[in-house]
């Protein structure tokens, strides 16, 4: 039985749709970089890409990223911090 495992997402929050984008029917996405902690939480989210820019998708994605939960990376039975993890949040209108 292996004592090693890689990080796996166990909870992905739904970001709040930016109000201005929602009322104008705008769709988009944002990519956030996070550090996964030894306990599977995340810290230090940074928006690295937003499309289209200026509609609030990046800000909403950063807020949602703080609620991401992972099973942490484990090496020799010990949780490891994992930097530079990218997560893409998509914003799509209900059809």
Which residue ranges define each predicted feature?
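Acidic, low-complexity proline/glycine/alanine-rich linker and hinge segments
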Residues: 1-23, 59-69, 95
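A beta-hairpin/wing motif
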Residues: 24-40, 57, 76-95
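Residue-level marker of intrinsically disordered, low-complexity segments enriched
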Residues: 6-10, 29, 33, 46
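A short, well-structured alpha-helical segment
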Residues: 26, 37, 41-74
């Amino acid at each position: 039985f292996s004592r090693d495992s890689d990080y796996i997402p166990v909870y992905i929050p739904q970001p709040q749709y930016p109000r201005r984008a929602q009322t104008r029917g705008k769709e988009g996405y944002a990519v956030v970089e996070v550090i996964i902690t030894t306990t599977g939480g995340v810290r230090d989210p940074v928006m690295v890409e937003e499309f289209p820019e200026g509609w609030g998708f990046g800000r909403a994605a950063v807020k949602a990223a703080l609620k991401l939960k992972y099973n942490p990376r484990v090496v020799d039975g010990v949780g490891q911090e994992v930097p530079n993890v990218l997560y893409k949040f998509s914003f799509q209108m209900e059809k």
